[in-house]
Amino acid sequence: MPATIAADQISYADLYARWEQGNWRATEIDFATDREQWDHEFSDIDRRSALWTYSLFFHGEDSVADNLSPFIDAAPREEQKYFLATQQVDEARHAVLFARFIREVAGAGADIGSSLEETQPKLTWGFRKVFERLDRMGDELRKDRSKP
């Protein structure tokens, strides 16, 4: 039976080491089967629904990747900064994965920027409000790191 570790016993250095050991590459995932299913098994409504969902995830991951740096800068300890930097890399990796899927499977966009632009109209009002607030929080923290 695996030993359990209490959350307060896990250090930021432990979290960083776990992150290093568990990496995967967004650029190496093969979407050939996904493309085949997209083209031949999904109905038009399935494709529209899936693209809407993937677009929300894509924009969310991109927004968090863009907005984590002030939180990293404001972290009080170096170990916290290093761990938070891993989270920023993970958000970027997730955005790259969704961008590739949207481009290679759904056929939207030619690169990350154009895929973001092409899927922008799919974002709902509520989604936009949440991530606009994240943008503002990042801007506020950039100006004053003492804000919680």
What are these regions (language model features)?
Residues 1-148:
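Non-heme di-metal
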